[in-house]
């Protein structure tokens, strides 16, 4: 028996060593092939006190995240090491980059060499299931095709939807100057666009269920972000509050999906009886939820896709809106300039879609908000194949680097947007006037790029611009209340204002 056990242990050891040796040989052969054909050079690595597990880096980033300094810590890292480098994080070797040419390669020119990857699906599936946010291949393509009509120019140009929610915001803002956190309001428009019904979290009549949905959804997103930061140790993450939040979100959305499925059956029956609508019939607004239900998609899959898009569309809009109001409330000089432009162009009337495009300084203000506070400040892809990135190798970081299949590449938009060599010595300062002459390319990516560019970017831009105009028309002064400290990150899958956006 002892002999057999010894043989088994020895066999396991030999097998493990063989895999390690073969993996090393295989990697070196692949590296040499790319080195000879593409001129790849060694990627720089961040210096570490623990070259085996990189515990010093792992705990450093954990502390930074706890102190709401995660993005700032990476910015310091890039300044110290370079625009592209490798880091060992608890046994995971990760490539970090804020180099525009590398980001362009990952998202556009070498798009087919990269994917979202299984780890993101594993980390987010408990809340989101599988959908356009975390899927690859045909699942992603199909979901993307269905959601695209939700954000066409015709849909986005329907400003009546935004005005409805602006009026609800005006109702919610106390007349006596009491402060309110405007970040909560942005959930309403997101659910209205996707569900055809609002969560109404800001209305005085809002139900406890609606408010709990807003809380549970945010709590679920926090849990996903925590899992992602834990890397390969995410499988050991357990938080009963996160699990409860996921269940509540599912129950809430399942009720909405059930209503949509019922409406879809009625729609098909009516279409069968009246295949040609009358000439004077009012055209129905397209919603992603109704489209999925009418296509006959299973309710569970509808829920998954809806939650995936809610993350992408709602959170993008929410982060942009909250950051814009955060800056506006703290900069009375820009309020004066914006009011002057709005008064000259609109003469007191509500803006049209075309008006919003003609408000030059407003557009500069929104662009600068996106530069300073990109809604998705960092993102990641996994290499599907052995490939090459154009920068990061050699002593100066200008040579190509080999990226093996399965390699995680994290690209940092936040720090790229604040690089002084790309944006000037005032890159860290909020200055909308820079957009009078600035014409950036891949150094400015607030909504991603390539085939996976954010489908809701026009929705976010139009909503933010419209709401800013209406706030400035309605109120003679917008003041920041509560915490007057500088902007602090609240980083999950997106990045919002950590201290909230308390205004009156």
From Swiss-Prot:
It is a single-pass membrane protein. Glycans are attached at residues 150, 385. GO terms for molecular function: heme binding; iron ion binding; oxidoreductase activity, acting on paired donors, with incorporation or reduction of molecular oxygen, reduced flavin or flavoprotein as one donor, and incorporation of one atom of oxygen. Its EC number is 1.-.-.-. Pfam families: p450 (PF00067). The chain crosses the membrane at residues 5-25. The keyword RNA-binding does not apply. One of its GO terms (biological process) is mycotoxin biosynthetic process. One of its GO terms (cellular component) is membrane. Heme binds at residue 454. PROSITE patterns: CYTOCHROME_P450. Pathway: Secondary metabolite biosynthesis. It catalyses: soppiline B + 3 reduced [NADPH--hemoprotein reductase] + 3 O2 = soppiline C + 3 oxidized [NADPH--hemoprotein reductase] + 4 H2O + 4 H(+). It is found in: Membrane. It comes from the Eukaryota. Its main location: membrane. Its cofactor is heme. Keywords: Glycoprotein, Heme, Iron, Membrane, Metal-binding, Monooxygenase, Oxidoreductase, Transmembrane, Transmembrane helix. Cytochrome P450 monooxygenase; part of the gene cluster that mediates the biosynthesis of the alkylresorcinols called soppilines. The biosynthesis starts with the HR-PKS pspA-catalyzed carbon chain assembly through nine chain elongation cycles, using acetyl CoA and malonyl CoA as a starter and extender units, respectively, to produce the polyketide soppiline A. In the first round, the KR, DH, and CMeT domains work to produce 2-methyl-2-butenyl thioester. Belongs to the cytochrome P450 family. This is Cytochrome P450 monooxygenase pspC. It comes from Penicillium soppii. The gene is pspC.
């Amino acid at each position: 028996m002892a002999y057999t056990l010894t043989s088994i242990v020895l066999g396991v050891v030999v097998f493990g060593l063989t895999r390690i040796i073969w993996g090393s040989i295989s990697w070196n052969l692949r590296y040499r092939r790319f080195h000879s054909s593409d001129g790849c050079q060694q990627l720089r690595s961040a210096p570490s006190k623990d070259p085996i597990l990189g515990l010093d880096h792992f705990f450093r980033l954990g502390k930074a995240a706890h102190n709401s300094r995660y993005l700032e810590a990476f910015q310091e890292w890039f300044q110290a090491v370079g625009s592209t480098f490798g880091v060992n994080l608890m046994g995971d070797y990760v490539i970090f980059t804020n180099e525009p040419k590398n980001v362009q390669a990952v998202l556009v020119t070498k798009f087919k060499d990269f994917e979202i990857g299984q780890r993101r699906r594993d980390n987010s599936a408990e809340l989101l299931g599988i959908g356009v946010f975390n899927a690859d291949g045909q699942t992603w393509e199909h979901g993307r095709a269905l959601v695209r009509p939700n954000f066409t120019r015709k849909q986005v140009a329907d400003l009546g939807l935004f005005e409805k929610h602006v009026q609800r915001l005006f109702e919610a803002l106390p007349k006596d100057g009491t402060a309110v956190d405007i970040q909560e309001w942005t959930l309403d428009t997101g659910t209205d666009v996707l569900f055809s019904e609002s969560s109404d979290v800001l209305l005085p009549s809002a139900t406890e269920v609606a408010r709990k949905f807003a809380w549970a959804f945010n709590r679920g997103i926090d849990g996903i972000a925590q899992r992602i930061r834990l890397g390969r140790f995410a499988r050991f993450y357990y938080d009963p509050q996160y699990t409860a939040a996921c269940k509540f979100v599912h129950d809430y959305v399942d009720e909405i999906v059930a209503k949509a499925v019922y409406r879809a059956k009625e729609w098909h029956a009516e279409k069968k009886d009246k295949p040609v609508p009358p000439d004077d019939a009012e055209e129905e607004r397209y919603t992603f939820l109704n489209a999925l239900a009418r296509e006959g998609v299973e309710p569970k899959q509808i829920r998954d896709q809806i939650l995936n898009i809610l993350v992408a569309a709602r959170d993008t809009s929410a982060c942009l809106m909250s950051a814009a109001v955060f800056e506006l409330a703290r900069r009375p000089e820009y309020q004066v300039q914006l009011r002057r432009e709005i008064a000259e162009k609109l003469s007191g009337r509500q803006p049209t879609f075309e008006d919003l495009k003609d408000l030059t300084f407003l557009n500069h203000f929104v662009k600068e908000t996106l530069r300073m506070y990109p809604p998705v400040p960092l993102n990641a892809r996994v290499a599907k194949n052995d490939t090459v990135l154009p920068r990061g190798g050699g002593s100066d970081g200008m040579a190509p680097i080999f990226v093996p299949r399965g390699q995680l590449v994290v690209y940092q938009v936040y720090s790229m947007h604040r690089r002084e060599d790309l944006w000037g010595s005032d890159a860290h300062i909020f200055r909308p006037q820079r957009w009078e002459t600035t014409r950036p390319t891949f150094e400015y990516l607030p909504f991603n790029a390539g085939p996976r560019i954010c489908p809701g970017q026009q929705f976010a831009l139009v909503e933010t611009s419209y709401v800013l105009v209406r706030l400035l028309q309605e109120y003679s002064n917008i003041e920041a209340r509560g915490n007057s400290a500088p902007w602090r990150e609240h980083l999950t899958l997106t990045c919002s204002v950590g201290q909230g956006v308390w205004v009156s």
